[in-house]
A protein has these predicted regions:
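Hydrophobic residue at the +6 position relative to the catalytic HRD Asp in the kinase catalytic loop
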Residues: 171-177
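ATP-binding glycine-rich loop module of kinase domains
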Residues: 33-34, 42-96, 102
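C-lobe/activation-segment region of protein kinase-like
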Residues: 163-167, 178-252
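Protein kinase catalytic-loop region centered on the HRD/HxD motif
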Residues: 153-166
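Active-site beta-strand termini and strand-to-loop segments that position acidic
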Residues: 72-76, 125, 177-179
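Juxta-kinase regulatory segment immediately upstream of eukaryotic protein kinase catalytic domains
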Residues: 1-59, 246-251
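Conserved structural core of kinase catalytic domains
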Residues: 102, 109-149
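A conserved alpha-helical element in kinase catalytic cores
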Residues: 83-117, 146, 205, 209
Length: 252
């Protein structure tokens, strides 16, 4: 949810024609429209800010996924991120995602969930950059190590809370770096499957893919064999002691 400068024209009423086909995307339904407007009102939403890096139907939004669109909204003077369920989503409500988001919040992870309805989740809006853009703008080794450790600490908290995010191998879409990193989007999370948050994030940051390549350019090589051995030890027993061994192997 990257912040850009906002002009007055970006802010519209919740009944604006510019927002009409976002509140029920991709298929508009007159019968459902008033229901979703009522949901927005129940959350205290007074206006929508059409801003973001993603374009949907010619309109800027904060994000777009398989389950929902993310738009920026206001309740009085407070700014929120709204995740609005797509009409073609693979689920009928946002209730389970909201439940999992609350569990993550209880572990100290994720933007604060402020409220939810059948079709909408309202949460704290995080002003920041995705981790790839952030790495492109930052080269200070201590800061990169600090952010990497903070991400893994949050992953450890999720592991301890028995909630698996499910998509942390794709960190660019699920971590926003502001004054600190935030893990976002719990639509694929589960409290049933085995947790592998630390494992997935470690591999994404240090071992495989574009993020790992950028981190390597800035921090230098890691001892891959030592890291892999530490990961195996942690996967076998997700104890703090083993997590500390992993952090040590990563020099963070």
């Amino acid at each position: 949810m990257y912040q850009r400068n906002i002009s007055f024209s970006d802010e519209v009423d919740i009944r604006s024609s510019r927002f009409l086909h976002l509140i029920l995307y991709p298929r508009f339904s007159e019968s459902e429209y008033e229901k979703r407007i009522a949901e927005l009102k129940s959350l205290g939403i007074t206006s929508i800010i059409l801003d973001g890096r993603t374009i949907v139907n010619g309109i800027r939004v904060a994000g777009k996924g398989c389950v929902g669109l993310v738009v920026k909204a206001k309740s009085g003077s407070k700014v929120y991120a709204l995740k609005i369920r797509r009409t073609d989503a693979d689920r009928k409500t946002m209730d389970n995602e909201a439940r999992l988001h609350i569990i993550a919040n209880s572990a100290g992870v994720g933007p604060s969930l402020e409220g939810h309805t059948k079709n909408i989740i309202a949460m704290e809006f995080i002003t920041g950059q995705n981790i790839i853009d952030w790495l492109d703008d930052n080269s200070e080794k201590p800061r990169i190590r600090s952010v990497a450790r903070a991400i893994l600490e949050q992953c450890f908290s999720l592991d301890r809370a028995s909630i698996d995010h499910g998509e942390l191998s794709r960190l660019a879409r699920h971590v926003i770096v502001s004054n600190r990193p935030y893990i976002v989007d719990f639509e694929s999370a589960s409290t049933i499957r085995k947790t592998c948050n630390v494992t997935a994030a470690t591999q994404a940051i240090f071992l495989h893919g574009i993020i790992a390549s950028k981190v390597k350019e800035r921090l230098g090589n890691t001892n891959r064999e030592k890291v892999i051995q530490a990961l195996r030890r942690y996967k076998n027993s997700q104890k703090r002691e083993n997590f500390e061994v992993l952090l040590d192997s990563l020099s963070i």
